Amino acid sequence: MKCPFCGSMDTRVLDSRPTLDGTAIRRRRECSSCGKRFTTYERYEEAPVLVVKKDGRREKFDREKIKNGMIKACEKRPVTYEQIEEAVNRICLKLREEGSFEVETKRIGELVMEELKKLDQVAYVRLASVYRDFREVDQFLEIVKELKREKEGEEQ
């Protein structure tokens, strides 16, 4: 595999293991030329799924968009890249299990919100503010109150 740092094709696998959900193989690699290490993920090729946008347009499903959105929401939060990768894998698995060749952006958003709520509540509020298009401070307060109620319900 080509090194992303120096472009050399001389790399070797140091460690290889399945992801927690078993949908991918995570490989830790080292470049023999520059000595830098990097991680790759090997996944099986899936049947194409189309995302139905709010305006009715359709585009090919792109797991990277989900991952990048979650990375942005988790910026400066104690959430690892691996945790985000596993969450994206769970979202993709749920979508596959639903078995549809088309999925609305609303459904993807719901799944992302569920995963973020479990990972980090601050990241959840960040994404909710964009996803639900918050316009007023009261909308932030309401979602924080909702999280507090859920937490109190779990403690009882």
From Swiss-Prot:
Keywords: ATP-binding, DNA-binding, Metal-binding, Nucleotide-binding, Repressor, Transcription, Transcription regulation, Zinc, Zinc-finger. The keyword Ribonucleoprotein does not apply. One of its GO terms (molecular function) is zinc ion binding. Negatively regulates transcription of bacterial ribonucleotide reductase nrd genes and operons by binding to NrdR-boxes. HAMAP family: NrdR. One of its GO terms (biological process) is negative regulation of DNA-templated transcription. Residues 49-139 form the ATP-cone domain. The gene is nrdR. This is Transcriptional repressor NrdR. Its cofactor is Zn(2+). A zinc finger (unnamed) spans 3-34. It comes from Thermotoga maritima (strain ATCC 43589 / DSM 3109 / JCM 10099 / NBRC 100826 / MSB8). Belongs to the NrdR family. The lineage of its organism: Bacteria, Thermotogati, Thermotogota, Thermotogae, Thermotogales. Binds 1 zinc ion.
